[in-house]
Swiss-Prot record:
Keywords of this entry: DNA-binding, Transcription, Transcription regulation
GO molecular function, one term: DNA-binding transcription repressor activity
SMART domains for the chain: FCD, HTH_GNTR
Name of the protein: Putative L-lactate dehydrogenase operon regulatory protein
Classification via InterPro entries: GntR_C (IPR011711), TF_FadR/GntR_C (IPR008920), Tscrpt_reg_HTH_GntR (IPR000524), WH-like_DNA-bd_sf (IPR036388), WH_DNA-bd_sf (IPR036390)
Domain HTH gntR-type, chain residue ranges per copy: 6-74
Organism: Escherichia coli (strain K12)
DNA-binding segment(s): 34-53
Protein's job: May be a regulatory protein for the LCT genes.
Highest rank taxon of the organism: Bacteria
PANTHER family: L-LACTATE DEHYDROGENASE OPERON REGULATORY PROTEIN-RELATED, TRANSCRIPTIONAL REGULATOR, GNTR FAMILY
Length: 258
């Protein structure tokens, strides 16, 4: 029997897996930039690209054009087929469906917070606290990733597999569509401050076993997030319209952004 030598990309893929385990990278976390990761592993960028493509095809990683490469959440088959793929199709047809998903999160996350307050173990609480502390990072990319992990840690603490898989499906679909807006929230000091206070209120209620308080705190938080992200999108659309206007308005906008 002839044993074919392993391809270099397969070896690099194994090293990426080992790195994920070594660094305790969790689902939803972003891998280092391609150049940095290639240097870290001591391989060429071409070999790394092939390895990453292999891991994406195996469902280990999730690649977003212009957004980077993320550790992918493990979806049950029913979740992938009935939640993730249909939502991806909707989002591809019309990105504005992201706001419909955000509205659906009200019902889902109100429940996860309620159940987490009733069922969270000491280990669950420790993970929620660590994710919250990571949202305080001065790097908006790290903070926004930690924000996702914070919400999923609460879903895990609900110990309800249907709620958890639904949440994972939502965040998988929303990963790229709201990434920029989520980062912007962490770049605006007053918004960042309110997010921190809201997250702390959710934690306090969950840790105190106050189910109704946790539900209300989560709904207030999501209402703020929805309103803020919608305002960001409207501001961006307004700016785009202004820059297309002829004459004084356009000149004024250019001077303002110069």
């Amino acid at each position: 029997m002839i044993v074919l030598p392993r391809r270099l990309s397969d070896e690099v893929a194994d090293r990426v897996r080992a790195l994920i385990d070594e660094k305790n990278l969790e689902a939803g976390m972003k891998l280092p930039a391609e150049r940095q990761l290639a240097m870290q592993l001591g391989v060429s960028r071409n070999s790394l690209r092939e390895a990453l493509a292999k891991l994406v095809s195996e469902g280990v990683l999730l690649s977003r054009r212009g957004g980077g490469t993320f550790i992918r959440w493990r979806h049950d088959t029913w979740s992938e087929q009935n939640i993730v793929q249909p939502l991806k199709t909707l989002m591809a047809d019309d990105p504005d469906y992201s706001f419909d998903i955000l509205e659906a999160r009200y019902a889902i996350e109100a429940s996860t917070a309620w159940h987490a307050a009733m069922r969270a173990t000491p280990g669950d609480k420790e993970k929620i606290q660590l994710c919250f502390e990571a949202t305080l990072s001065e790097d908006p990319d790290i903070a926004s990733q930690a924000d996702v992990r914070f919400h999923l840690a609460i879903a895990e603490a609900s110990h309800n597999i249907v709620l958890l898989q639904t949440m994972r499906g939502f965040f998988d679909v929303l990963q790229s569509s709201v990434k920029h807006s989520r980062q912007r929230m962490y770049l605006v000091p007053p918004v960042f401050s309110q997010l921190t206070e809201q997250h702390q209120a959710v934690i306090d209620a969950i840790f105190a076993g106050d189910a109704d308080g946790a539900r209300k705190a989560m709904m207030a938080h999501l209402s703020f997030v929805h309103t803020t992200m919608k305002r960001f999108d409207e501001d961006q659309a307004r700016h785009a319209r202004i820059t297309r206007l002829p004459g004084e308005h356009n000149e004024h906008s250019r001077e303002k952004n110069a």
